[in-house]
């Protein structure tokens, strides 16, 4: 899972507050969050980015260096990165990569075996693959170029993307929680040698696809090296079979329970938008002083601790020679990819296809280090397949440099055919309307325009009728009268809505 949050002026101080800078990169997690930040770099012009910043991929950096880089716009090399961010501006983005809870439990209970190291390896490799993907598809900036007709704002590929990474293995509540805070600097080196801000729109557009690449890589490595099997993928995340019991997962997910409880107590459990508010309100200060061995004892003594420990003890880590051979028979075909994508959305972007491809790749299909390359190839094959149409060909970046990757949308022949069938059905006359004589008046008042509209809808001989009016014009309340008229004529009314919120309004207005 990948979540993205904008950093603020105090973000660096928070991550650095738990770091012990006397520890090297190999002094691993005796207390969570103590490991110093490490540099990460990605991009086609990696050597140029490295030389400009004065640091290398994987280098350990001090808190002062991170502070200067993000909050004072000074690179590790001492090079200026433009004006320092204001207190209310965004110095960077926190890309948080989180392993599935069952994977975190392997790490938490795997101290006495090679399991913990394999989980760490899988997580790090998965983050690396996801950053490779983001570098290719979210590594953009915007700049003005002078042309005969005037200035034009174009979207241009960066030389690379860069930042620092903090490793954490527990949640704020002290549960096993393998995750990395990958801080992406807002100011990046461009191909012309200048420094500009990252295009945040492109970053957010590619977040789900990158998160899927991360999850697919984790599944690939753990299935090959530990022999575990994963259950169904739900929203890009799959739990390990044997550790996927909902009660077990919930028992080691204290933060999730706290958030759910706060939402329920405040009557907000049906509104996903309130989850971020709940996260902030219920947030506690993270305990980084409890030694890891004490936490391990608590995890083992928990209600499901014996079950998890028994599962971990039964794993037999495999070496390179024992790992299963990859098989391309496990890779999804273009027709399957397109069918799965089109089942969820009528039009889609390249990122939508990448998201689905990563979800469909079964463990054992490829070598983990080839995940991003494989996803790219399958996406290209699906978009080039017969029956894939570009809905907005004029927005291709090959034709218009002002467009982002996400500007171009696609669909399939099957979707177009379905739309045409829908139009044919909607415009067909079926003579099933309610006659004017049978329409009974109802209590309450409608404006003349509302009454005329509902009379036309109820008495229509077409399979579909459309009511067009601005927000607040009374469309929903007017439909209450139509609902009553249909019921009086012996017809059963079923209400459908595109979103849960809209459905709630229909129920509240007694329309459905």
Residue ranges and their predicted role:
Residues 267-271, 277-349, 358-512:
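ASCE P-loop NTPase motor cores of helicases and related translocases
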Residues 1-342, 349-358, 374-376, 380, ...:
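Intrinsically disordered, flexible peripheral segments
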């Amino acid at each position: 899972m990948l979540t993205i949050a904008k950093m603020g002026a105090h973000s660096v101080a928070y991550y650095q507050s738990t770091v012990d800078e006397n520890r090297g990169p190999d002094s691993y997690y005796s207390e969570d969050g103590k490991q110093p930040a490490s540099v990460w770099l990605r991009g086609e012009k990696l050597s140029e980015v490295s030389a400009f910043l004065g640091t290398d991929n994987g280098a350990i950096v001090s808190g002062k260096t991170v502070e200067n880089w993000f909050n004072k716009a000074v690179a590790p090399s001492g090079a200026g990165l433009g004006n320092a961010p204001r207190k209310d501006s965004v110095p960077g983005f926190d890309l948080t990569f989180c392993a599935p809870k069952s994977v975190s439990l392997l790490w938490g209970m795997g101290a006495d075996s090679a399991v913990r190291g394999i989980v760490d390896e899988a997580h790090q490799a998965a983050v690396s693959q996801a950053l490779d993907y983001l570098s290719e598809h979210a590594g953009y900036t915007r700049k003005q170029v002078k042309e005969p007709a005037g200035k034009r704002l174009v979207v241009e590929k960066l030389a690379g993307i860069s930042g620092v990474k903090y490793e954490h293995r527990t949640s704020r509540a002290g549960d096993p929680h393998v995750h990395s805070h990958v801080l992406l600097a807002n100011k990046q080196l461009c191909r012309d040698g200048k420094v500009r801000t990252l295009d945040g729109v492109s970053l957010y557009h590619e977040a789900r696809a990158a998160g899927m690449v991360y999850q697919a890589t984790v599944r690939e490595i753990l299935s090959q090296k530990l022999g575990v099997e994963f259950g169904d993928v739900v929203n890009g995340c799959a739990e390990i079979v044997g550790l996927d019991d909902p009660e077990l997962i919930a028992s080691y997910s204290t933060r999730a329970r706290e958030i759910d409880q706060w939402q329920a107590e405040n009557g907000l459990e049906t509104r996903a938008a309130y989850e971020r508010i709940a996260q902030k309100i219920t947030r506690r200060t993270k305990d980084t002083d409890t030694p890891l061995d004490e936490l391990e004892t608590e995890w083992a003594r928990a209600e499901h601790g014996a079950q998890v420990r028994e599962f971990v003890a039964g794993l037999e880590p495999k070496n390179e020679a024992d790992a299963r051979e990859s098989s391309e028979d496990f890779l999804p075909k273009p027709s399957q990819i397109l069918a799965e994508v089109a089942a969820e959305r009528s039009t889609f972007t390249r990122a939508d296809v990448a998201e689905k491809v990563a979800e469909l790749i079964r463990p054992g299909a490829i070598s983990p280090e080839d995940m991003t390359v494989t996803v790219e190839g399958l996406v290209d094959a699906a978009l080039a397949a017969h029956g894939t149409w570009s809905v907005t060909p004029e927005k291709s970046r090959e034709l218009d440099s002002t467009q982002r990757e996400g500007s171009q949308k696609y669909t399939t022949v099957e979707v177009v055919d379905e739309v045409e069938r829908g139009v044919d059905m909607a415009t067909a006359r079926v003579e099933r309307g309610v006659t004017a004589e049978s329409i009974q008046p109802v209590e309450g008042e409608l404006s003349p325009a509302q009454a005329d509209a509902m009379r036309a809808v109820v008495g229509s001989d077409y399979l579909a009728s459309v009511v067009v009016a601005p927000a607040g014009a009374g469309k929903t309340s007017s439909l209450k009268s139509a609902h009553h008229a249909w019921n009086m004529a012996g017809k059963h009314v079923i209400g459908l809505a595109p979103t849960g919120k809209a459905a709630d309004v229909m129920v509240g207005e007694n329309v459905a």
